[in-house]
Amino acid sequence: FDDEKWRPEVGDTEFFFFDRAFLENLVIAKYRLNQQDLTQDEFDILCKLAHGIASLMPPVDKYLYLDCSVSTIIEHMRQRGREYEDDLDLMYVYELKELYDEWAKTLPPERTLRINMDGGEYDLNEIVRFLEA
């Protein structure tokens, strides 16, 4: 397996955008570990695998963390109208939000813009300035 052929060459593009940071996926794995759906060994394997895959990806320059309350998350889920989200346990949403907040605290503050989405208003100019800096 030649991992070099999967890497984009420097200069191929000016901008990569991921709607999620790859390692953010470990938040779900951490939740599953807390629920005892994964053993510590399984979680450790997932972490090693995720970090290995992440090392093949372009490094993240900047993070936008969309933050909001659990009630806003629930409201957004209702607006999406996805059937499988209709019966989600409120405790699940609360615990997952706590884990995402823990993860966000590990991000480099100088490269992270935390945007409060409660109320639905945000300063687009602030976001653009952050991304262009």
Model-derived regions, located:
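Surface-exposed alpha-helical segments enriched in charged/polar residues
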Residues: 1, 5, 51, 98-105
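ATP-dependent small-molecule kinase phosphotransfer cores
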Residues: 1-48
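A structural motif corresponding to the C-terminal end of an alpha-helix
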Residues: 17, 52-61, 102-113
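Conserved nucleotide-binding/hydrolysis micro-motifs of P-loop NTPases
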Residues: 22-24, 68-73, 119-121
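A glycine- and Lys/Arg-enriched "phosphate-lid" helix/loop adjacent to the NTP-binding pocket
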Residues: 28-98
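NTP-dependent small-molecule kinase module
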Residues: 74-133
